[in-house]
């Protein structure tokens, strides 16, 4: 079973997360940030991960610490659930439309953390959520998961649609890249014989 439970506690936040990579897309998300909950719910749905997150953070300061730390813990959980990554597809990419918006996302579960994020927002906030925190989440996730992740919005107008296309794109590439490749026969998908070393 490809599952992981992580609890991370700092002076700023406490995040408890459970993920099942072979789930059905069920989620129970409570971060105290409505927009982030919405994005994580749709990520679970479209990745087909079962995902539970309970986060308590210093929201009286702002949403930065909670958003970043949820990204960190989700990345840690993905890495733990994948183990030695034997038999996974490893690579995936998608062009994800959301009404007037089109975003391209590409993923390599390589063990080498790197993010390219070419997405711009014309407004500073979506409701109470700072749009710059979308990038912070993706950076935290890529770094802690040890993945190479490229996110590029080719065009778009509505900030909510742009953010949603990024999260749905991440969901779809995760779903494809963690899938077990029957042709791989349990091999580690690397000529080095190991990932992340």
From Swiss-Prot:
Enzyme class: lyase
A Pfam short name: IGPD
Keywords, in A-Z order: Amino-acid biosynthesis, Cytoplasm, Histidine biosynthesis, Lyase
Organism: Xanthobacter autotrophicus (strain ATCC BAA-1158 / Py2)
Chief location category: cytoplasm
Family: Belongs to the imidazoleglycerol-phosphate dehydratase family.
Pathway(s) the chain acts in: Amino-acid biosynthesis; L-histidine biosynthesis; L-histidine from 5-phospho-alpha-D-ribose 1-diphosphate: step 6/9
Family annotation (PROSITE patterns): IGP_DEHYDRATASE_1, IGP_DEHYDRATASE_2
Gene Ontology MF annotations: imidazoleglycerol-phosphate dehydratase activity
Keyword set includes Oxidoreductase: no
Superkingdom to which the source organism belongs: Bacteria
EC number: 4.2.1.19
InterPro entries: IGPD_sf (IPR038494), ImidazoleglycerolP_deHydtase (IPR000807), ImidazoleglycerP_deHydtase_CS (IPR020565), Ribosomal_Su5_D2-typ_SF (IPR020568)
Catalytic reactions of this protein: D-erythro-1-(imidazol-4-yl)glycerol 3-phosphate = 3-(imidazol-4-yl)-2-oxopropyl phosphate + H2O
Annotated gene: hisB
GO CC annotations on file: cytoplasm
Name of protein: Imidazoleglycerol-phosphate dehydratase
Keyword Lyase: yes
Compartmental location: Cytoplasm
GO biological process: L-histidine biosynthetic process
């Amino acid at each position: 079973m490809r599952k992981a439970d992580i609890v991370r506690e700092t002076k700023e936040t406490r995040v408890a997360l459970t993920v099942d990579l072979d789930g059905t897309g069920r989620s129970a998300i409570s971060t105290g940030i409505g927009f982030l909950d919405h994005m994580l719910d749709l990520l679970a749905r479209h990745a087909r991960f079962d995902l539970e997150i309970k986060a308590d953070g210093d929201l009286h300061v702002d949403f930065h610490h909670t958003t970043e730390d949820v990204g960190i813990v989700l990345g840690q959980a993905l890495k733990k659930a994948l183990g030695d990554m034997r038999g996974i597809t490893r690579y995936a990419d998608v062009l994800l439309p959301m009404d007037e918006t089109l975003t391209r996302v590409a993923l390599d579960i390589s063990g080498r953390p790197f993010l390219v994020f070419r997405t711009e927002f014309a407004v500073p906030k979506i409701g109470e959520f700072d749009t710059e925190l979308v990038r912070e989440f993706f950076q935290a996730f890529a770094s802690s998961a040890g993945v190479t992740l490229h996110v590029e919005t080719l065009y778009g107008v509505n900030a909510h649609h742009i953010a949603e296309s990024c999260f749905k794109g991440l969901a779809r590439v995760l779903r494809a890249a963690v899938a077990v490749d029957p042709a791989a026969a349990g091999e580690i998908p690397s000529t080095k014989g190991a990932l992340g070393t």
